Amino acid sequence: MSHIVKIYDTCIGCTQCVRACPLDVLEMVPWNGCKANQMASAPRTEDCVGCKRCETACPTDFLSIRVYLSSETTRSMGLSY
């Protein structure tokens, strides 16, 4: 089941989210928008299980990475209205 993984331009290129992901959904790609000259990318969102470990690992005040669970997942967890 695929979830939406959104990476914002507040990414500081620290690699914490990449290292936290148990399924290697994320990887770092070149980007000139921060000192690290890299940012997270999510090329394999079809493998995302929605554990949100990447969100938990993100050290920025505004989470630079967010996982939006699919509607099927939110229904099964009783989170939908």
Swiss-Prot record:
Subcellular location as annotated: Plastid, Chloroplast thylakoid membrane
Gene Ontology molecular-function annotations: 4 iron, 4 sulfur cluster binding; electron transfer activity; metal ion binding; oxidoreductase activity
Residues annotated as binding [4Fe-4S] cluster 1: 11, 14, 17, 58
Catalytic activity, reaction form: reduced [plastocyanin] + hnu + oxidized [2Fe-2S]-[ferredoxin] = oxidized [plastocyanin] + reduced [2Fe-2S]-[ferredoxin]
Membrane topology, from the record: Peripheral membrane protein
Enzyme Commission number(s) from the entry: 1.97.1.12
GO biological process: photosynthetic electron transport in photosystem I
Binding site for [4Fe-4S] cluster 2: 21, 48, 51, 54
GO CC term, one of those recorded: photosystem I
Ranges for domain 4Fe-4S ferredoxin-type: 2-31, 39-68
Quaternary state and interactors: The eukaryotic PSI reaction center is composed of at least 11 subunits.
HAMAP family tied to this protein: PSI_PsaC
Function: Apoprotein for the two 4Fe-4S centers FA and FB of photosystem I (PSI); essential for photochemical activity. FB is the terminal electron acceptor of PSI, donating electrons to ferredoxin. The C-terminus interacts with PsaA/B/D and helps assemble the protein into the PSI complex. Required for binding of PsaD and PsaE to PSI. PSI is a plastocyanin/cytochrome c6-ferredoxin oxidoreductase, converting photonic excitation into a charge separation, which transfers an electron from the donor P700 chlorophyll pair to the spectroscopically characterized acceptors A0, A1, FX, FA and FB in turn.
Protein name: Photosystem I iron-sulfur center
Organism of origin: Tetradesmus obliquus (Green alga)
Gene: psaC
